[in-house]
Structure formats: C-alpha cells, structure tokens
Amino acid sequence: MNEKAKLPMLEPSDSEESRVFVKKAFEMSEKFNTPVLLKMVTRVAHSQSIVDTEERVEPDRVPYVKDTAKVMMTLNSRNAHIRVEERTKALIEYAESTELNRVEMGEDTSVGIITDSTSYQYAREVLGDKVSIFYQCLSSLLNPYMSIS
C-alpha cells in the first residue's frame, strides 16, 4: 500500500510475476474501484526469465459513465475522503489475506526474513531453503509488516 496516495502497490520480483501482477492489478482495480500501482525496479525491468503465456482474453466493453463525484473539487473532497478511507480498510483486509503474500518455510524455522520485490530473489539465491521467508508482494497499512486490529 502506498501510504501517501493510499493506493495498492504490487512489487514483482521477476518477469513472470510482472506479467501475473499486471493482470492482478486490473482485477484489483475493478474490484476496489481504484488505480493500482505496479512498482518496477531496474533489476526486474532489465531481467530476462521464462514467462508462461495464457490465452488472450478480450475484456468486456463497459460504456462510459460520467461520474462527477470522482472529480476532485472542494465540493466533492469530503465525501471522496470518506470513500478513500473505506476503500483503504477493504484493501488492508485484502492485503492481509491475499495469496500474493506468502510464507515459505525453510529448514531453520527460528530464522525468518521479510522481503519484497528483488530482495526476495537475493535472499533465495544466497540462503536457498535454509531460512523461512515471508514474501510480501502487496503490503498493508503504514507499517507493512504489522497487522491491525
């Protein structure tokens, strides 16, 4: 979650995840009615890896609906802020339960690493399956490693 903009942000660790996350970003955007950021770092953008392809799916054409409530003018800002806060709560719940974030248990479960993006690949390359890794692709809240109650 991008704390300042209160937008969800996906951080892929390789080319295949980039492809999957673009599709996931569109799904999340439709579900939560919000833009979704895809954070690309130079290492991933310049990398090459095997990518699985899927059958192309043509999206349904949705007619344009003029919605002035989405135009940020003083008149709309108070209601928009309420909607953003409600959406943020829903996104936090989603981030804490999504299959995008995963724990990979290693041989030594007394040691764990919290990673995202390319640091996941670095940790796997150096440590292999020796330690447990919490791989966080979609973070939640201001402190992305803590759950709220």
Identify the residue ranges that each predicted region occupies.
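Flexible glycine/proline-rich, aromatic-decorated loop/lid segments
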Residues: 1-4
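Flexible, low-complexity linker and terminal segments
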Residues: 12-149
